[in-house]
């Protein structure tokens, strides 16, 4: 972990002008263990998440960083990209407006920034896909949720629903009871 975090710190200082604090490194280390960490606004959650995501990606994991909205996904992805590039890690940002063909390619990156809502809808669309080729997501095994409390408590009350035509036609006559 020390070597990867050190490489992240060097890239962060060189390309972003940011030197991580001990608290950020501790929080990043906790994230790599699947633990929740609480950080207030302005304490460097974005950098912390990038360090944890980099560590996991360098160790063979496919990482999703879930944000609250498209603005944060785009901002954080673009801001942290120099760190990922310096470490040879592929990254992408999927927005609500991203078309299906582009999503398929973007999901192949080691680190993907996306809103929790969009990731949820992609999961549902893949679940009802007629063929494996119709699926857009790739497997991932590590997730970092920015604003986890908001996503898991506030947004959990809003269901994700997909509606549309199905390949299966309903019976014209219902059996008599």
Residue ranges of each PLM-predicted region?
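Conserved P-loop NTPase motor core
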Residues: 1-177
């Amino acid at each position: 972990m020390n070597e990867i975090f050190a490489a992240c710190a060097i890239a962060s200082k060189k390309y972003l002008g940011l030197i991580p604090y001990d608290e950020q490194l501790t929080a990043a280390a906790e994230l790599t263990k699947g633990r929740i960490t609480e950080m207030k606004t302005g304490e460097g959650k974005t950098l912390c998440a990038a360090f944890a995501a980099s560590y996991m990606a360098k160790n063979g994991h496919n990482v999703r960083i879930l944000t609250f909205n498209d603005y944060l996904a785009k901002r954080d992805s673009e801001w942290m990209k120099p760190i990922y590039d310096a470490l040879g890690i592929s990254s992408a940002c999927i927005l609500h407006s991203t078309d299906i063909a582009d999503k398929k390619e973007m999901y192949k990156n080691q680190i993907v920034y996306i809103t929790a809502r969009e990731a949820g809808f992609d999961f549902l669309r893949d679940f009802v896909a007629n063929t494996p080729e119709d699926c857009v997501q790739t497997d991932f095994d590590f997730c970092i949720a920015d604003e986890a409390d908001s996503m898991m408590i506030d947004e959990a009350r809003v269901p994700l629903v997909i509606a549309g035509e199905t390949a299966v036609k309903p019976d014209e006559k219902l059996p008599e009871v």
